[in-house]
Amino acid sequence: MKKLLFLLLALICMSTTASAAKVICGDERTDVWVPMLRGKKVCLLTNYTATINGKHLIDVMLEKGINLVAIATPEHGLSGKASAGAKIASSTYKDTGIPVWSLYGKTRRMTSEQAAQFDVLVFDIQDVGVRFFTYYVTMLYTFDALADQGKRLIVFDRPNPNGMYVDGPILEEKHKSFVGGLPIPVVHGLTMGELAQMAVGEGWVTKVDVEVVCCQNYTHQTRYQLPVKPGPNVRTMQAVYLYPSTCLIEGTVFSEARGTDFGFEAYGHPDIAPTGFSYTPRSIEGAKNPKHQDKLCHGVDLRKVPKNQILKEGFTVKYVIDAYNRYGKGEELFAGNRKHFFHRLVGVDYIYEMIIAGKSADEIKAMWRDEVEKFKVLRRKYLLYEE
């Protein structure tokens, strides 16, 4: 019966796609979700990306008379201004008295006591479709509490800007962490609604009733332009497309250009030979105390790499290999706790080992090709939109 309901939902979602029409996100479909939420006590898991024509979903819900009893927020907070990894305190929303629960503070999991205070949890956050982008993990970390209290999740779905392809190694269980919550490729090609249903369907998380308010006029080949930046250091579509590969620089001693206005669109280090391009990371909003703060970094500028080329190439370790060669100090590229974090990002051991052994990016990419093809078949069961 549940398989039949999922198939029906998928057919409904797919029937609303049209490549030429404007994409309509789930939260814009007030005619669908207002009746679903009317008379319910609602908790909204969200951040600054949940806007409808410039107005935040929180305010739209209140205007529509929805009984919003709590707001929960992920990494970077409701405003999106907190730096990566910075703990965020709980607060209240404006002058409404509605509590804002930080799920990136003393705890990263919703408690059963919190879940007891509402009837339904709504999730609406713009993601980038990458395994180490943490918003989906925050969503999954609510499932235990929801299941304990018998509460359901409604996802107001949004397009995946990297949803056109699937690439990268499958996360190994021993490397599971907050930057890798599921056994999926680095670029998984799923929307948050699809991913939530896959996680439940495959038994990867505690079973929760998940409903999805689908996007309209969207397919997985839609080149969706994000109306707002999805993170404080992912500011442009160039950064969104580069992020799956350049985020690996975080697992090295090189700068990933945090502390500039082109984060993840460049990388560099103070101690390599001049390259003709340099930048100086500064402590700025959303990037407090970046690597090599106030030091001139020589490096590589990726801002003019054609977007079609980035997408065609997919997930690659070539930037880490380039940093390794430019640095010239072998394993010191991963000094301190960087090696451990690099393993968490890539989700496997062999990438590090092959880089040290001098293997090429193409040789390394060949290692995950077969498992990605198998994942694509599994993924297809949960697609709500045409491929």
Name each model-derived stretch:
Residues M1-K22:
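Bacterial Sec-dependent N-terminal signal peptides
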Residues G80-G85, I154-K176:
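Glycine-rich, charge-decorated loop segments at or immediately adjacent to ligand/cofactor-binding or catalytic sites
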Residues D127-M139:
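Glycine/threonine-rich flexible loop motifs
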Residues H175-T246:
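Conserved anion/nucleotide-ligand pocket segment
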Residues N217-K295:
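Glycine-rich, aromatic-lined ligand/substrate-binding cores of catalytic
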